[in-house]
Amino acid sequence: MDLTGSAFVIGASGIGKACALAFARYGVRGIVIADLTLEAASAVAAECKSQATHPHFLAEAVAIDVTKEESVYQAIAYAHQVLGRIDYAVNSAGVGVQLANEIAEASVSEFEKMFKVNVTGTFIVTRALSALMKTQDPVPVDEAVPARGVSRGSIVNVGSASGFVATPGMVQYTAAKHAVVGITKNAALDNAKHGIRVNSVCPSWVDTPMIRKAMDDIPELGEMIQKAVPLGRIALAEEVADAVMFLSSPKASYATGCNMILDGGTTLAAHV
């Protein structure tokens, strides 16, 4: 995978952490990891250094609150200052469902919190990254194949298979992830003329700390996932990161506005 530029990853656990480590292993020259908790981001940056393959690899950490515009712009400005440019950006910030209820009993406060982080946060991050990348010099996607054009950057949002199907008792999550798909599509359309690609990965159940906690709280959840997924197992965060690496790389130079479902076949037969 030809990933020789610099990366900016939001999210220091689960999918975000897996993406950061994958970028380091695939040879990026530098990375900035952002998280609400600076200590968590710093720990991932240190781990990236231990796995990096670029001889002059650089890894830094920065705090970010995706719900606050000033925080997002400051974090992105810091990453740009440290790295010189941002070639690959991944937004993995998000919150899961705390109260699962049918629509008649659904929590308005949780709905609003879900949208503040998962939707408004995605919008602010995508907006800020788009503005920054527009100022960057275009670089050839593949010098050996000029027809692939030039790039000012790639953005990958972490969505969900819930952006395509509904799940009983989870209207807040379903609605929020449908919105992420919409933001990704519109951003891709607006940014195409600037040489900026915008895509998303949309997994179903992934083995992350958030899902493991849910499985601890709901003992039958593991068995339910196993039965619901045609491939018969939960996804690894590393498998989602593999898809992000592809979408970030020159191999996906013609992919923009793509919302890649990674669900082991779940949405083929049922809800998530």
UniProtKB/Swiss-Prot annotation:
Please name the GO terms that the record assigns under molecular function. Answer: oxidoreductase activity
Catalytic residues, chain numbering: Y173, K177
The UniProt entry, under InterPro entries, shows: NAD(P)-bd_dom_sf, Sc_DH/Rdtase_CS, SDR_fam
Per the UniProt entry, the Enzyme Commission number(s) are: 1.1.1.-
The induction comment states: Expression is up-regulated during sexual development. Expression is also up-regulated during confrontation with the arthropod fungivore Drosophila melanogaster.
Q: Is NADP included in the keywords of this UniProt record?
A: yes
Q: What class of enzyme is it?
A: oxidoreductase
Which Pfam families does the entry mention? Answer: adh_short_C2
Its keywords, alphabetically, are: NADP, Oxidoreductase
Q: Which residues bind NADP(+)?
A: I15, D65, R127, Y173, K177, V206, T208
The family annotation for this protein states: Belongs to the short-chain dehydrogenases/reductases (SDR) family.
Provide the function of this protein. Short-chain dehydrogenase; part of the gene cluster that mediates the biosynthesis of sordarial, a salicylic aldehyde structurally related to the phytotoxin pyriculol. The most interesting aspect of this pathway is formation of an aromatic product from the highly reducing polyketide synthase srdA. SrdA synthesizes a reduced polyketide chain from one molecule of acetyl-CoA and five molecules of malonyl-CoA. The polyketide chain is then reductively released as an aldehyde.
How is this protein named in the record?
A: Short-chain dehydrogenase srdC
Q: Which organism is it from?
A: Neurospora crassa (strain ATCC 24698 / 74-OR23-1A / CBS 708.71 / DSM 1257 / FGSC 987)
